[in-house]
Design a protein with these regions (language model features):
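Short, conserved, GDST-rich strand-edge loop motifs in beta-rich repeat architectures
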Residues: 4-26, 70-83
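Asp-box/WD-like beta-propeller blade repeats and closely related beta-sheet repeat scaffolds
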Residues: 94-168
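Blade-level signature of beta-propeller repeat domains, shared across WD40, Kelch, NHL, RCC1
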Residues: 333-373
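Beta-rich, blade/repeat-based domains predominating
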Residues: 52-62, 105-117, 152-175, 210-227, ...
Length: 373
């Protein structure tokens, strides 16, 4: 069976004010689709799905028949809040067909996830600090929200932590618990998931607390499910956690920096991902403009930094690792480029392939493995 890999890139299409106060002038037209050359790592433009407003994060369902995109906005249909859009994925060419859109009931939705049973979509609203759950119909369309949770509180940083800022949602492999890093609260909140009703309830141990001022952003699990890697935006660290799937609780193993010891400039973290092999973890630094590379101890889950690779651009907000684990694509938000690196399977180190693809304000990278014959 022949296959090909398509790459879907979310962009900012309109001006947006971030939590830092910075206003970014979005230059994208919507969702960009490319074909990955599985030998060279080069990207061939396929199409632009125009008219999608600020699709800053994307998620496929498990069948890859449907794609969901947040619309990172502060108002929707005249009310405070953003929205999430559903698309059908054409199986032969990978074209997207708009299905419908629903409000997320919070401002600046920045992350979307589909649960393992493809029955619900989970959205984190960054600016207002909330989580929204939406049922998915059999035809891929979204129904009105089945649950909504508003976070409360603040952190020690008056500029960045004056209120709650939910930044992402991750589920465990058993589909029993949902985890929400909240940058404003310095907490990884834990919810029990009722997959039938699409409801979330605080766990018996409702959160894991990180160092004050750390600002947790994203959580990535090891393929074994035994360890989690929590990236902290504000203090540029990774918290390495052991996970108990029975209770939905975490214990800290250690904390590692994402920046070189001699770096003295300003930088914040963005994304964290585990290689499909489970042997390496990667984290992006915005300011240092690099990818930190770590080797995973397969016995303990602990990390050892093996180096940093410049992303050849500014502000790597996101990156993607292709399903084979051979290539990593870094999205440089402020210099409008997608840069391809080859992953060394033995060391985890990154080597530029020379492929630099122009993409206006790219902020999310997702892959679709498509059968061609």
């Amino acid at each position: 069976m022949k296959t090909e890999t398509l790459v879907y890139v979310g962009t900012y299409t309109e001006p947006i004010r971030f939590g830092t106060g910075k206003i970014l002038q979005g230059k994208g037209e919507g969702i960009y689709v490319y074909r990955l050359d599985e030998t060279s790592g080069a990207l061939e433009p396929v199409r632009v799905v125009a008219g999608v407003v600020n699709p800053s994060y994307l998620a496929f369902d498990s069948t890859q028949r449907f794609l969901y995109a947040v619309n990172e906005l502060k108002s929707y249909e005249g009310k405070p809040g953003g929205s999430v859009s559903a698309f059908g994925v054409e199986p032969k060419a990978g074209d997207l067909t708009f299905l419908n859109k629903q409000p997320t009931h919070g401002t600046d939705p920045c992350h979307v996830l589909v649960n393992k049973k493809d029955s619900h979509v989970f959205v984190a609203n960054f600016m207002s600090g909330s989580v929204c759950v939406l049922p998915v119909r059999e035809d891929g369309c979204l129904e009105a929200a089945s649950d909504f949770l508003q976070h409360h509180g603040s952190g020690i940083d008056p500029a960045r932590q004056a209120g709650p800022h939910a930044h992402s949602v991750t589920l465990d492999a058993a589909n029993r618990f949902a985890f929400v890093p909240d940058l404003g609260l310095d907490k990884l909140l834990v919810y029990r998931l009722d997959p039938r009703r699409g409801m979330l309830e605080p766990n018996a141990v409702p959160w894991f607390k990180v160092k004050p001022g750390a600002g947790p952003r994203h959580l990535a699990f090891h393929p074994s499910g035994k360890w989690g890697y929590l990236i902290n935006e504000l203090d540029s660290t990774l918290t390495v956690l052991s996970y108990d799937g029975r209770s939905g609780t975490f214990e800290e193993l250690h904390v590692v920096p994402t920046l070189p010891e001699d770096f003295r400039g300003e930088s914040t973290c963005a994304d964290v991902q585990v290689a499909p092999s489970g042997r390496f973890v990667y984290a992006s630094n915005r300011g240092h403009d690099s990818l930190a590379i770590y080797k995973v101890d397969q016995r303990t889950g602990r990390l050892t930094c093996v180096g940093h690779e410049p992303t050849q651009g500014k502000t790597p907000r996101s990156f993607g690792i292709d399903p084979t684990g051979r290539f990593l694509l870094a999205a440089n938000q402020d210099t409008d480029s997608l840069v391809t690196f080859r992953i060394d399977s033995r060391s985890g180190r990154l080597r530029p392939t020379g492929a630099v693809t122009p993409v206006p304000t790219p902020v999310c990278v997702k892959f679709l493995l498509r059968k061609t014959g």
